[in-house]
């Protein structure tokens, strides 16, 4: 499907990397033509009155574990990078090609190729062929690659192909089957735990190897003070190192696990309050490049178990936008930075022409009421599962309209 006629959205607050300005946006043939205070509708255009609400780029969610269109559309997500942890894993060109074609036209799914066969961390997968099939990056999946030789070869190969390597940063030798972070809370609850330093050790090694290989490294979730310090130092040295985080890790600490509620069983596990505060500081100072939903819907068969036995993961697509807009209201970041974190930066890492309101880019647009109040209710969620750690929490910020390539989507 293609856009039938030009679309002009008037009376909008346009969110661009330079700030938020009043104006209009016009698009045709799936691309943004012009935006600004002097843009006006032309004869034959479809016209939408934004009535002073935010017009922002559709979100680009980097690192989801399931394709969940209703949840994505509710949350303003028009593109999602799918992790290779599927059944079967995305370790063959045919599987990557199938995923790259799925979802269109109302959602573009960008597959992340499995770094190793079966995601077992031993033998490199057919990365170049998977890139040809549509892979936009390489990912280690839910686990860290323990073998440094394999990891170095992966990074060298990725550097030749100019593909970003997306890593999970926990030293598996330390984490084992841990369900919590070592500390007072885990001890009191009697949960199997691993030291927070497992993250810093993994990050330090991967940064050293990425520097050696000259590769682009994206650490999908950084959640500790030491981890942020390592990324900050790597950036200061000019390395192509970026990092992300999910809302749970900057809004919740390990205190949220005190009632054994398995919806707070995450990977990495929730950290101490000091690390949560460090996450907010890292978002504010630019150390964090991406905020993603970490969307990983888990049904009752995975969550209605003892805490240590439950599968980690949260359904995050529907709450991502509201949680990030909360950072704006709390004056941690300005509005334009919120959409750099959730749209522009992930689009650049993936190399896709989206994530920003600019002429010539895809008309992936979200009309947003940043102040609209609502209650997160897992019983009413659009996701394929309701495992949100934010159930019954108040939120602000809802999508009023969504367009993918200029085509209106139902929200």
What feature does the model see in each segment?
Residues 1-42, 407:
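N-terminal metal-binding scaffold of metallo-dependent hydrolase/deaminase domains
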Residues 12, 362-411:
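C-terminal cap of metal-dependent C-N hydrolases
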Residues 12, 25, 30, 52, ...:
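Divalent metal-coordination and catalytic microenvironments
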Residues 75-95, 102-123:
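Metal-cofactor-binding active-site regions of metalloenzymes
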Residues 92-109, 156-167, 319-323:
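Alpha-helix-loop-beta-strand connector modules within alpha/beta enzyme cores
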Residues 122-291:
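Histidine/acidic residue-rich metal-binding segments in metalloenzymes
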Residues 188-216, 285, 290-291, 296-370:
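His/Asp/Glu-enriched, well-ordered alpha-helical/loop segment
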């Amino acid at each position: 499907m293609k856009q039938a006629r030009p679309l002009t959205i008037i009376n909008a607050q346009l969110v661009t990397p330079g700030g938020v300005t009043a104006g209009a946006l016009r698009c045709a043939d799936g691309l943004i033509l012009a935006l600004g205070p002097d843009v006006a509708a032309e004869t034959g255009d479809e016209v939408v009155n934004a009535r002073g609400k935010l017009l922002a780029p559709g979100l680009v969610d980097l690192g989801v574990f399931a394709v969940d269109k209703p949840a994505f559309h509710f949350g303003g997500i028009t593109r999602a990078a799918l992790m290779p942890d599927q059944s079967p894993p995305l370790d063959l060109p045919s599987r990557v090609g199938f995923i790259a074609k799925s979802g269109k036209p109302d959602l573009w799914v960008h597959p992340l190729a499995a770094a190793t066969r079966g995601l077992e961390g031993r033998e490199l997968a057919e990365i170049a062929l998977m890139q040809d099939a549509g892979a936009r990056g390489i990912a280690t999946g839910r686990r860290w690659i323990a073998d440094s030789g394999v990891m170095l070869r992966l990074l060298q190969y990725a550097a030749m192909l100019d593909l970003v390597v997306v890593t999970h940063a926990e030293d598996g030798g330390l984490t084992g089957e841990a369900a919590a972070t070592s500390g007072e809370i885990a001890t009191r609850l009697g949960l199997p735990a691993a030291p927070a330093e497992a993250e810093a050790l993994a990050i330090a090694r991967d940064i050293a190897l990425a520097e050696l290989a000259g590769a682009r490294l994206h650490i999908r979730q950084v959640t500790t003070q030491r981890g942020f310090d390592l990324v900050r130092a790597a950036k200061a040295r000019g390395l192509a190192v970026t990092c992300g985080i999910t809302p749970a890790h900057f809004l919740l600490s390990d205190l949220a696990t005190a009632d054994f509620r398995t919806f707070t069983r995450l990977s990495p596990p929730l950290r101490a309050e000091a690390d949560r505060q460090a996450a907010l500081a890292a978002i504010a100072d630019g150390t964090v490049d991406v905020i993603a939903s970490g969307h990983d819907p888990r049904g009752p068969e995975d969550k209605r178990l003892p805490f240590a036995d439950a599968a980690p993961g949260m359904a995050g697509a529907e709450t991502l936008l509201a949680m990030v807009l909360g950072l704006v209201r709390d004056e941690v970041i300005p509005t334009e930075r919120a959409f750099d974190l959730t749209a522009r930066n992930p689009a650049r890492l993936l190399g896709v022409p989206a994530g920003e309101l600019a002429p010539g880019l895809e008309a992936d647009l979200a009309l947003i009421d940043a102040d609209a109040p609502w209650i997160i209710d897992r019983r009413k969620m659009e996701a394929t599962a309701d495992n949100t750690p934010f159930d019954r929490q108040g939120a602000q910020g809802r999508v009023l309209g969504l367009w993918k390539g200029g085509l209106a989507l139902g929200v």
